[in-house]
Regions:
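N-terminal low-complexity, acidic/polar interaction/targeting segments
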Residues: 1-179
Length: 179
C-alpha cells in the first residue's frame, strides 16, 4: 500500500492519510519526544511506510493495552501526529523508534489496508483567548508545578525552568501532564 494524501488535503482543510501506530500504556502529546519499542507486524509496517515518505506517523492510544490485535474500534479517535526522528531495527525483529509529537489530530476514518492501519486524519485546532484570566491560570499552574517539582526529586530542575518559559497555555498543559 502506498502513502496517500486525501482529496480533502488538496483542498487545504488539513486532512490527510497517515499510517497509524497504536500505542499501549502511553499517550504522546505534542512537543513530547519519546522512545517506543514496537514489535507487532502491522505497527512495524506502518513505521516502514512512514519512513518511505515524510516520516509522519499517527500516534493514538489503544483503549485496552492488553489487546494484541486491535481493530479500529479499539483505538481512541484523538491522537498526535508525530515525526519519526530515528528508527533502529533490533536483532530480535522489533524496532526502537524515537518520535516527536507535533500536532493533536482526530481520526476521521480508517482507510482499508491489510498491511497496517491507515487513517484519514484532521488536525485539531487549539483555540484559546489570551485574557487576564487565562494568564492568571497559567501562572497558577506554573507555581503549582514548581511546588510539585520540589517534592518530586525525579523531575530534573531543568524541566521547571523550561515550563516557566512557556507562554502558550496549550503547550504548558501538554508539557506538565507528562510529569
Amino acid at each position: 500500500m502506498f502513502f496517500q494524501k486525501s482529496d480533502n488535503d488538496r483542498q487545504g482543510d488539513g486532512a490527510r492519510a497517515v499510517p497509524l501506530l497504536p500505542l499501549r500504556d502511553i499517550i504522546v502529546f505534542p512537543h513530547m519526544v519519546v522512545p517506543l519499542f514496537v514489535g507487532r507486524e502491522k505497527s512495524i509496517n506502518a513505521l516502514e511506510e512512514a519512513m518511505r515518505h515524510d516520516k509522519e506517523i499517527l500516534l493514538a492510544a489503544q483503549k485496552k493495552a492488553k489487546t494484541n490485535d486491535p481493530t479500529p474500534d479499539d483505538i481512541f479517535t484523538v491522537g498526535t501526529l508525530g515525526h519519526i526522528i530515528q528508527l533502529l531495527r533490533l536483532p530480535d525483529g522489533t524496532v526502537k523508534v524515537m518520535v516527536e509529537g507535533k500536532r493533536r489530530t482526530r481520526i476521521r476514518k480508517f482507510i482499508p489496508n491489510e498491511s497496517f492501519f491507515l487513517c484519514d486524519v484532521e488536525l485539531v485546532e487549539e483555540k484559546y483567548e489570551s485574557t487576564v484570566e487565562v494568564e492568571a491560570l497559567a501562572r497558577s499552574v506554573q507555581a503549582t508545578f514548581e511546588g510539585y517539582v520540589k517534592l518530586n526529586k525525579r523531575i530534573p530542575p531543568e524541566t521547571l525552568m523550561q515550563v516557566q518559559t512557556i507562554d502558550d497555555p496549550s503547550r504548558l498543559a501538554d508539557t506538565i501532564v507528562v510529569h
